Amino acid sequence: MKLHEYEAKELFSKYGVKIPPGKVALTPEEVLKIAREIGAPVVLKAQVVVAGRGKAGGIKVANSPEEAYELSKRMFGMNIKGLIVKKLYVTKFVEVEREMYLSLIIDRASRRYLFLASPVGGMDIEEIAKTSPEKIKRVYVDPATGLRDYHVRSIVSWLGFKQGTSQWQQAASIVQAMYRIMVDYDAELVESNPLAVTKEGEVIPLDARVIVDDNALFKHPELEKALEEDPRDVTEFEAYAKKIGFHYVELDGDVGIIGNGAGLTMATMDLVYHFGGRPANFLDIGGGASREVVKEAVKVLLHHPRVKVIFVNIFGGITRADEVALGIKEALAESGGTNKKIVVRMKGTNEELGRAILAEIGVPLFDSAEEAAKKAVELARV
């Protein structure tokens, strides 16, 4: 789960980190009210969970509440990398002396946490690594022993602070807070870019990012609730599929994919690519799927406006071919007919029963996954 900037900053604040005053607005009128409350100049930040908001016009500075109001009218409804701007974070403009980069990730190869720190900030870490790799310091933290003072000293010194100063203590507190957020919230990323020294000499995160492991959301009901209320980077189809219990990922093609098992589903996508097609999604119904599960999976793709063809690829072990066929039949019946083509390849348990059911409703069944994929791509081009 990717947290919005304002949500990430709320976590930072919860752990004692000072952040610039700011509130979330849902309308231009709210922007005007907030700008008057905190005082101009203000920064308007589109709350979409993608990188590069600034370059896409999603971050604007307003020198008066009235200017903030006018800017917000153009910003609400903007499309930034496929996501529509529905919220603006209105925050106090801060004059900056210098910018730094600080993040905490999980290094799966070493099975440790990894701090990435640079005295140069305000740009992607990939860009820093490309232009100034010598300016990035890596500090590993073993989760078995946790964050120690020598880790903090190493990071804060690299960022350019002198030990014993107020700025040193502020930066050290931010490092410690980021580590606590990482552990307490089962995060995959905690980042401040830029981490800034203001003209007043304070060390504060001007931007904040937090990504929480989806598999740990059950431990954080407040985040689960926030995700339900605001799916953020999740499409309506991904949200519905998750509610039903599918593993579903939205892609940008027009060939709908349904498989059982992640490996088979990914192999099915590869076949579609191989024959020149473009998958519209990844949808894994899992093992032992009932007709009800299959029906709901097919209905998701029948209602998807971009899907032209649905390619169902099933290997029946504990998944029965007749249950799959009945699920397809019921989905078509409940959808009231469709002009979308369905191509099926099924092998395994009760294959002949499934074949007979599909023959009744005129859905072609292929013995070879390659033949089925080729046919699906051909139909998508019609």
From Swiss-Prot:
One of its GO terms (cellular component) is succinate-CoA ligase complex. GO terms for molecular function: ATP binding; magnesium ion binding; succinate-CoA ligase (ADP-forming) activity; succinate-CoA ligase (GDP-forming) activity. Pfam families: ATP-grasp_2, Ligase_CoA. It catalyses: succinate + ATP + CoA = succinyl-CoA + ADP + phosphate; GTP + succinate + CoA = succinyl-CoA + GDP + phosphate. SUPFAM superfamilies: Glutathione synthetase ATP-binding domain-like, Succinyl-CoA synthetase domains. Succinyl-CoA synthetase functions in the citric acid cycle (TCA), coupling the hydrolysis of succinyl-CoA to the synthesis of either ATP or GTP and thus represents the only step of substrate-level phosphorylation in the TCA. The beta subunit provides nucleotide specificity of the enzyme and binds the substrate succinate, while the binding sites for coenzyme A and phosphate are found in the alpha subunit. This is Succinate--CoA ligase [ADP-forming] subunit beta. It comes from Pyrobaculum aerophilum (strain ATCC 51768 / DSM 7523 / JCM 9630 / CIP 104966 / NBRC 100827 / IM2). The gene is sucC.
